C-alpha cells in the first residue's frame, strides 16, 4: 500500500524542518504513520491477508525505533510530533 505522490508531498511539507528536508526523523515517522493507517484500513477489510499483517508489524517496529531515537536525542521535537500525529507517549 504505497502512498500516492501528492499525499507524500503533503506530509513531507507539513513535517519537514526546511524546504529540502525529506529524511528527518519527523518526516520518516509521519510517512510511516500514514502507511500504518492505510494498512490498518486494508486489514479491516481483508482480515485473512497475513502477509500485509506482517508488513504492518514491520512498519510499526520501524516507527517505534525512530520514535525512541527521537525521544532520546531531541525530546521537544518528539513531544510536538506525537501531539500532531495523536500517538501515545510510551
From Swiss-Prot:
Cellular compartments per GO CC: cytosolic small ribosomal subunit
Any Pfam family hit: Ribosomal_S15
SUPFAM superfamilies reported for this sequence: S15/NS1 RNA-binding domain
CDD domains listed in its UniProt record: Ribosomal_S15p_S13e
GO terms assigned for molecular function: rRNA binding; structural constituent of ribosome
Origin: domain of life: Bacteria
Coiled coil: none
Record-linked InterPro entries: Ribosomal_uS15, Ribosomal_uS15_bac-type, uS15_NS1_RNA-bd_sf
Any Gene Ontology biological process: translation
Residues in the signal sequence: none
UniProt keyword list: Ribonucleoprotein, Ribosomal protein, RNA-binding, rRNA-binding
Protein family (similarity comment): Belongs to the universal ribosomal protein uS15 family.
Biological role stated in the UniProt entry: One of the primary rRNA binding proteins, it binds directly to 16S rRNA where it helps nucleate assembly of the platform of the 30S subunit by binding and bridging several RNA helices of the 16S rRNA. Forms an intersubunit bridge (bridge B4) with the 23S rRNA of the 50S subunit in the ribosome.
Database matches in NCBIfam families: S15_bact
Subunit relationships: Part of the 30S ribosomal subunit. Forms a bridge to the 50S subunit in the 70S ribosome, contacting the 23S rRNA.
Name of protein: Small ribosomal subunit protein uS15
Amino acid at each position: 500500500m504505497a502512498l500516492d505522490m501528492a499525499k507524500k508531498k503533503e506530509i513531507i511539507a507539513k513535517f519537514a524542518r526546511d524546504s529540502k528536508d525529506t529524511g528527518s526523523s519527523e518526516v520518516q515517522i509521519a510517512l510511516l504513520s500514514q502507511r500504518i493507517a492505510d494498512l490498518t484500513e486494508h486489514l479491516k477489510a481483508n482480515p485473512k491477508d497475513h502477509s500485509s499483517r506482517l508488513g504492518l508489524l514491520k512498519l510499526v517496529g520501524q516507527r517505534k525505533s525512530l520514535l525512541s531515537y527521537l525521544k532520546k536525542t531531541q525530546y521537544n521535537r518528539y513531544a510536538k510530533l506525537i501531539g500532531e500525529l495523536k500517538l501515545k507517549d510510551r
